[in-house]
Amino acid sequence: MRGFTRTVYALFGVLGVALGLLALVKPELALRPGDANGLTTHLLREEGALGVFLGLMAFWCFTHFEERRPVHFALLVFAALFSLIHWREYLLDNRSIGSPLANSVPLLLLAVTAPYKPLPR
């Protein structure tokens, strides 16, 4: 399980940093043509900065495996909130089912790999 967990951290780290940097540099790539304006690009850049931070936290968990518990649970809470936002939008008929399903994958991976028991000292 340790190898799988470290793979999850590495994947989240690479995706978070890479996609976050892309959103910082080219936020209009995430928008439909004509939807880019000052507010939408600003919000996407902020989300990109958050993605970089989350990716760096995943890398920290990868490199500090024995001490990762509080950071892992913080990532788990974030993933739960992010997933709930998308499920709410789906239930209000504002999104297709693909959106909440895709946004539940990180939550499930973090839940499966969570260090529920503290490591012995």
Give the ranges of each region predicted by the language model.
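Membrane-helix boundary elements
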Residues: 2-41
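Core segments of alpha-helical transmembrane spans in multipass integral membrane proteins
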Residues: 18-19, 40-62, 77-81
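Short juxtamembrane and helix-loop transition motifs at transmembrane-helix boundaries
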Residues: 30-40, 60-69, 91
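Membrane-helix boundary connector in multi-pass membrane proteins
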Residues: 62, 66, 83-101, 118-120
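Membrane-water interface at the C-terminal end of transmembrane alpha helices
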Residues: 107-121
